[in-house]
Amino acid sequence: MENQEKPLSVDEEYDLWKSNVPLMYDFVSETRLTWPSLTVQWLPTPVQELDGGFIKQELIIGTHTSGEEENYLKFAEINLPKEILSNEDPQEEAGEEYQSSLPAPRSNIRITAKYEHEEEITRARYMPQDPNIVATINGQGTVFLYSRSEGLQSTLKFHKDNGYALSFSTLVKGRLLSGSDDHTVALWEVGSGGDPTKPVRTWNDLHSDIINDNKWHNFNKDLFGTVSEDSLLKINDVRANNTTIDTVKCPQPFNTLAFSHHSSNLLAAAGMDSYVYLYDLRNMKEPLHHMSGHEDAVNNLEFSTHVDGVVVSSGSDNRLMMWDLKQIGAEQTPDDAEDGVPELIMVHAGHRSSVNDFDLNPQIPWLVASAEEENILQVWKCSHSLPIVGGPPKVNKDIIS
């Protein structure tokens, strides 16, 4: 017993991670926010090179002040070294000052606009067909529509309790799903010219407990998935009278789900038991596979839009994990097996509290923004030297203006 290693404290784990930053990352920025943000999303900002060799990207964040101050929906920008586009090493290009900053991640986030918001923002998501429009949901389940340039536009009331589920369709302009702790799901049409403040359809019987997440399918405009505290995963069709076309009984409640951007049949879901499950929509009776690595509940999932088969997850264990589904079943040496399953390609251990939300940049492969409970927002890109899917992904430099 005396020889047993004492587990590292959270601060010791952070210091260990920080010492490995130059080896594992091309870029890291860390910002301490005044208040924690429960939500983060990249805006689809065109990649433009600025004076000084930087590129600008933009983010949506919120505040959770616990009633102590006014809450705000915020828009932020960050300047990134242009070398991350070509998978070069920014440390080599930016000189001594940048090299010395990597072990102690610096902040270069700047708030460019903010709008007052009724209560905390649990989720904020932009409309894919019009990124000037942003939907939010708060701790009372009220949905709001904001214009980036003009502020609050509409208040959408239906839910009676806290909501975390919010999803715009990538296929139909203005088609918005919201879900709440009151067990209900609502469909809003906010881009059709009608009254956006009244739901076009609501569901009170999809689930018998809290709606943890809902997401639209990326290939079929009428399909959406829901997960709930009732331990059910449901695939639903807005055209069907009974709506639900498939139901999965989960081992424990799922907190999150995500549909692939590359395969119309692939779905991932995860929750309280810490595993990430993969399903084929053509046969949902049993999962295709489950991936182990997290040590606590998984709260968010996202498929890469750039690389087929890459999934990212985040959890209450303060970790984000990148998975390569093409590596499932790959042979490992005993030493490699001790580090994790073969499909686990990257662990981001830079957070010291539960990860509230994260997002993969739609323009720049492997660039991630992640927000944690303890007021920290990080922007990071894993090293191009890591053995990631198909070698380093390329960015089309024609998009740089």
Curated annotation (Swiss-Prot):
Residues 335-339 are annotated as: Interaction with the histone H4 N-terminus. Changing L266E: Abolishes interaction with HAT1. Keywords: Chromatin regulator, Cytoplasm, Nucleus, Repeat, WD repeat. It is found in: Cytoplasm; Nucleus. Pfam families: CAF1C_H4-bd, WD40. Its main location: cytoplasm. WD repeats lie at residues 116-147, 158-189, 206-237, 249-280, 293-324, 350-381. GO terms for cellular component: chromosome, telomeric region; cytoplasm; histone acetyltransferase complex; nucleus; Rpd3L complex; Rpd3L-Expanded complex. GO terms for biological process: chromatin organization; chromatin remodeling; regulation of DNA-templated transcription; subtelomeric heterochromatin formation. The record marks L266 as: Important for interaction with HAT1. One of its GO terms (molecular function) is histone binding. Induction: Repressed in presence of farnesol, probably through a intracellular decrease of diacylglycerol. Component of the HAT-B complex composed of at least HAT1 and HAT2. In the cytoplasm, this complex binds to the histone H4 tail. In the nucleus, the HAT-B complex has an additional component, the histone H3/H4 chaperone HIF1. Belongs to the WD repeat RBAP46/RBAP48/MSI1 family. Regulatory subunit of the histone acetylase B (HAT-B) complex. The complex acetylates 'Lys-12' of histone H4 which is required for telomeric silencing. HAT2 is required for high affinity binding of the acetyltransferase to histone H4, for the nuclear location of HAT1 and for the HAT1-HIF1 interaction. Alone, it is unable to bind to H4, requiring HAT1 for high affinity interaction with the histone tail. HAT2 also has a HAT1 independent function in life-span regulation. This is Histone acetyltransferase type B subunit 2. It comes from Saccharomyces cerevisiae (strain ATCC 204508 / S288c) (Baker's yeast).
